[in-house]
Amino acid sequence: LDYVNHIDPELSNNIGYTRLVNMNLLREINGKAQAVKFSNDAPDGQSNAMASMMAAQTGVGVSAFPKQLENGKNNFLKDNYSLLEGNYPEKETDVVLIVDSNNTTNINALKNLGFDVKDNQKIGFSDIVGTKMKLANNNAFYTKLPTGNFIPNQDLQAVYDNPENTELTISGILRIKDSSTMNLLAPGIAYSDALSTN
């Protein structure tokens, strides 16, 4: 990885990695802190093979977009995705919603973020852009038991209110450009690779 981490930006200005991460995400919904997640899986865990296949029809299926090595050069998102609402990410704490050519996305991505949506229900882009959630650090999210084991803290409001959390914002809604050959991001939430490494 040292070679990739130190690659000349003239050779490749956007580097992406595949990682499996579990972020401790919370969102305040109707005045109450609730656990949420970046996932296209059915919230009840009852995903079937057909639903999984449909979810992956567009995009390769990754949820992290590549890190840009040098500003002012090729930008993976700007080069390959049109901005439909909001802004392209400016910070690693900005996440985006990816939609397909019909401006639809994976409904489970929205349900898993606490949006109350039904199949085929239309929701305005402006109702999504600007949504904020907290990324809780492990020290706030987990409680140590007398046995030495750790379990998730049951007081989600205290976890949500912890000043050491990082606030994330859905900054924009993007759609793959017709001219793009780099349709890597599946419909749903996409975030900077840098977010998953901090």
Kindly give the residue locations of the regions a language model identified.
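Basic-flanked hydrophobic alpha-helices used for secretion and membrane insertion
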Residues: 1-198
